[in-house]
């Protein structure tokens, strides 16, 4: 049996926080605001995985009202989500992810993001695609107010 999941996340860019996307710390004058480390890409991947297995969303599993998740490492959150999928007998067929950001340029970090996500999902790098795009200066991402990410995963039950 195959299951598809889709995830989407947005975080505001603010001064005084590190910018972590796809498990990679990116040098930039702003970072993403959130209860956890606000890794918009790993949050989208986690939501996609939860959607594929019919287990709700990351807000249900890691509520921002719970102090245990304050400044949490999103890689650990995704690892927990993936453990739930594995317990249900799923493996990753592929993941396709898009980061929407006007700045900074993310191309130099894409391969490292792919490697991080592949490791967390116990997959080969070839099973994970990450791409980045802009909105041609339109909307909140185009104005540099925030960054968004989308992810789609295809899982297969063993």
From Swiss-Prot:
Annotated signal peptide: none
Record site: Transition state stabilizer: 35, 134
UniProt remark on cofactor binding: Binds 1 divalent metal cation per subunit.
Pfam families: YgbB
GO biological process, one term: terpenoid biosynthetic process
Keywords: Isoprene biosynthesis, Lyase, Metal-binding
EC top class named in words: lyase
Catalytic function, reaction form: 4-CDP-2-C-methyl-D-erythritol 2-phosphate = 2-C-methyl-D-erythritol 2,4-cyclic diphosphate + CMP
Protein name: 2-C-methyl-D-erythritol 2,4-cyclodiphosphate synthase
Taxonomic placement: Bacteria, Bacillati, Bacillota, Bacilli, Bacillales
Gene name in the database record: ispF
């Amino acid at each position: 049996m195959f299951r598809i999941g889709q995830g989407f996340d947005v975080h505001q860019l603010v001064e005084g926080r590190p910018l972590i996307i796809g498990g990679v710390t990116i040098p930039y004058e702003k970072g993403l605001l959130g209860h956890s480390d606000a890794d918009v890409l790993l949050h989208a991947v986690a939501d996609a995985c939860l959607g594929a297995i019919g287990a709700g969303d990351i807000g249900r599993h890691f509520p921002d009202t719970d102090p245990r998740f304050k400044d949490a490492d999103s890689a650990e959150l995704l690892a927990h989500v993936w453990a739930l999928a594995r317990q249900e007998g799923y493996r990753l067929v592929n993941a396709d992810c898009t980061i929407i950001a006007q700045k900074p340029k993310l191309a130099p970090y894409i391969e490292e993001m792919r490697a991080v996500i592949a490791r967390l999902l116990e997959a080969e790098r070839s099973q994970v695609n990450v791409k980045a795009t802009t909105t041609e200066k339109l909307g909140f991402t185009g104005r540099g107010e925030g960054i968004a990410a989308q992810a789609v995963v295809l899982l297969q039950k063993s």
